[in-house]
Amino acid sequence: MGLWGKKGTVAPHDQSPRRRPKKGLIKKKMVKREKQKRNMEELKKEVVMDDHKLTLEELSTKYSVDLTKGHSHQRAKEILTRGGPNTVTPPPTTPEWVKFCKQLFGGFSLLLWTGAILCFVAYSIQIYFNEEPTKDNLYLSIVLSVVVIVTGCFSYYQEAKSSKIMESFKNMVPQQALVIRGGEKMQINVQEVVLGDLVEIKGGDRVPADLRLISAQGCKVDNSSLTGESEPQSRSPDFTHENPLETRNICFFSTNCVEGTARGIVIATGDSTVMGRIASLTSGLAVGQTPIAAEIEHFIHLITVVAVFLGVTFFALSLLLGYGWLEAIIFLIGIIVANVPEGLLATVTVCLTLTAKRMARKNCLVKNLEAVETLGSTSTICSDKTGTLTQNRMTVAHMWFDMTVYEADTTEEQTGKTFTKSSDTWFMLARIAGLCNRADFKANQEILPIAKRATTGDASESALLKFIEQSYSSVAEMREKNPKVAEIPFNSTNKYQMSIHLREDSSQTHVLMMKGAPERILEFCSTFLLNGQEYSMNDEMKEAFQNAYLELGGLGERVLGFCFLNLPSSFSKGFPFNTDEINFPMDNLCFVGLISMIDPPRAAVPDAVSKCRSAGIKVIMVTGDHPITAKAIAKGVGIISEGTETAEEVAARLKIPISKVDASAAKAIVVHGAELKDIQSKQLDQILQNHPEIVFARTSPQQKLIIVEGCQRLGAVVAVTGDGVNDSPALKKADIGIAMGISGSDVSKQAADMILLDDNFASIVTGVEEGRLIFDNLKKSIMYTLTSNIPEITPFLMFIILGIPLPLGTITILCIDLGTDMVPAISLAYESAESDIMKRLPRNPKTDNLVNHRLIGMAYGQIGMIQALAGFFTYFVILAENGFRPVDLLGIRLHWEDKYLNDLEDSYGQQWTYEQRKVVEFTCQTAFFVTIVVVQWADLIISKTRRNSLFQQGMRNKVLIFGILEETLLAAFLSYTPGMDVALRMYPLKITWWLCAIPYSILIFVYDEIRKLLIRQHPDGWVERETYY
């Protein structure tokens, strides 16, 4: 049996690669893929090892090592040659040029490149067959290429800080390790540590490999980055737990030794360590496409289908109408390019960037632009507990003295004014908590509030120190008046801490003070303090103690007991107290009370969880902490709502076995990590489907990953929060990984898509709102942009079908798409949310697309058609004013385009030269362009909302007002600036020609207000089903 114990699991020290016979290339690839898949499945399995169960003799035999002298130098060299260095294999990284190419040629850019190439092809055909071709298609090709390159560079720059997960794993590796080889202690590079090496660690060291301890003195390790446990964990040679992650005789690679010393045997190195497996798991995970990327891909397919369909239809139609095949090809290319919204790529990029900047101001740092929108699609949030839902600092929550439970202040401000302080018992309790305490404030922090001051010492002692400093008096003064003369530090065997102090009165005697596990403290006591008076311990007191202990423990709080003894006068000042061979009394102490501590919820979290619930988002707690604590916090923040019961609580209330509880009666469930170990996918799916309120406690990194995959399997868009190394696989696998900026490890930050700078869960809800808003606003922006496609395409179609002079040229289309439409489209990114944004269910990425048939129907079939009518109305008005009635324009195209025909007659017999005709044609094209700008005013205003009336939403978006002014001034500038007739073929217009479009603008506004009114009055009615995009 290997180190991992079970068949089908990876043995960490089986580090020699197996040889395979050479096979064909295709088969090799298939084998490789299958192997990768199998490896990933094995990585997801729980850590299985038996080294923690072995006796020292068995350990010595297994690794062929002397437990006092270690390996010989020769033996260590052989193992190093065979097993390889003690390093974590870095994953293959994507080269920067590949990332840049993805920005330049991926997604929407591909559509624009296609447009640019088609334009160039059209220009080449014109050059080949015409003596003096127009250069419109060449200009269009160049402009499209520039647009793609500029926006590609911009996007690459925004996402240049891509995640390099293994960098921080490298940083975590200690450089030197102290090993014993051939009976001698020696410092070696950590890469040279081998399986079976005898290693020594001390406080402040990082553990160089996975170790099985054979001896330890007061050793504590910080496993928080690996298991999520906030308290330092004691380490000893004893086998204390079946689970290798929880037993005390294993130390894990790259965790920190906080205090004490230990000696151990290396049982895994490099990739085979628990941390190495997490690294492999994180870097080997396949990351899916972001919802917004999928939406843009869907949009491209849609636009491409529409463009090709129209292009091919009119190519066939132009051939039927008698055009030559070359002209028909030019038409085909022209129609396809006219369908490409050139400005949309830049608009989407700028919208996402603006939102990312806005979120950064709200403490959400977005590493991947597309993650902004993903957060808005989120339907499930798997949140870590410590530091995300809680304040990440132990705080005194309750006290029990004088037979009464008192509540302390756990708010983030901590005023400490919530209970009576007149009792002598409280006076004694405060003194013990302050004196029998090794924590201290760091220097030069007097100006900071007590709650914000940094301390030395463990979390519980620091909590007591701050609490006494706030609620009683200066601890430093108290310690000065009562100097410590002897101490027994807390250890996991004794489960108490004892200190002896000189009394501050003039008696020159000592007081012994003790704190520790309540049941242990009670064993030392024969009396108790009640209202300052000492009484003999009795059954009533013991029962009251037991009830208080159970009540506070049931709240998920860490409870400590406190007692004291005034030592007799024979132990006066100068007595040599010996804590190794006890020479003073340690029995018949006086019990004072209990103090309980908890890492309290953040103030803003309950409201944030409530907002998630009303927004249809399921919040699941996934923590490495104890189930009782996890459940208490879940109830405190509303993940388990008031009145909701678990199966255990229903069973207790009805006094029936759990097996008889109706599953539908228990809406909430607390799942222990041990239960998840052997659970099947179907059973996990049932838990996730049947319980709206879920807490997973004591989970391992692999289990967090399995939970995320389970949610995704059920179709959820999953956001995961985490701060430890243990969270990084789940962060990477999630649709959006959210790391903690303050408490987060480097690994978690680099596996994540987004970082919460203030570590606050409430910031996620802000992010969800921003994500939904950007999706709404992108929809509005696309709706606005696509609408002008119809008045851009129809002139070309009428030019082919009706044979009229071209109403709108290529250059003027570019002026709309990359000029007048850009700022207004971007201004919609600044639009504030509609009132229902956090009250509707999360969008379904499969059905609720960014661009759906209803949006296309509105943009192309309704608003776009009104705009096209406006354009043609202006076009025919100008030509009529110049003598060409609409009916006489039909079929005039060939004569109109004939350069050698200089006596073309209008409806009134006036003759027009080719030059004169072109001036009128370009004036009409300028007027058509201006008309589109005027009707786009109305389109922009109606795009502000999808359901609400403009009168509900208001006109508070100043950027949008600026957008209307900008497009109007730009249109005027292009029309009236001298020289534009040569540069862009734009001519000055009469003021009355600007007014032709006003009635159509009013029509668009009134039409859309009536549509939205019908949607509001008849939810789920025909109008909503067909037009609510």
Swiss-Prot record:
InterPro entries, sorted: ATPase_P-typ_cation-transptr_C, ATPase_P-typ_cation-transptr_N, ATPase_P-typ_cyto_dom_N, ATPase_P-typ_P_site, ATPase_P-typ_TM_dom_sf, ATPase_P-typ_transduc_dom_A_sf, Cation_transp_ATPase_P-type, HAD-like_sf
Basic residues biased stretches: 18-36
Membrane-related topology note: Multi-pass membrane protein
E.C. numbers: 7.2.2.13
Keyword Nucleotide-binding among UniProt keywords: yes
Catalytic residues (positions): D384
Recorded catalytic activity of this chain's protein: K(+)(out) + Na(+)(in) + ATP + H2O = K(+)(in) + Na(+)(out) + ADP + phosphate + H(+)
Enzyme class: translocase
UniProt xrefs under PROSITE patterns: ATPASE_E1_E2 (PS00154)
Keywords annotated in UniProt: ATP-binding, Cell membrane, Ion transport, Magnesium, Membrane, Metal-binding, Nucleotide-binding, Phosphoprotein, Potassium, Potassium transport, Sodium, Sodium transport, Sodium/potassium transport, Translocase, Transmembrane, Transmembrane helix, Transport
Chain's role: This is the catalytic component of the active enzyme, which catalyzes the hydrolysis of ATP coupled with the exchange of sodium and potassium ions across the plasma membrane. This action creates the electrochemical gradient of sodium and potassium ions, providing the energy for active transport of various nutrients. Plays a role in sperm motility.
Name used for this protein in its record: Sodium/potassium-transporting ATPase subunit alpha-4
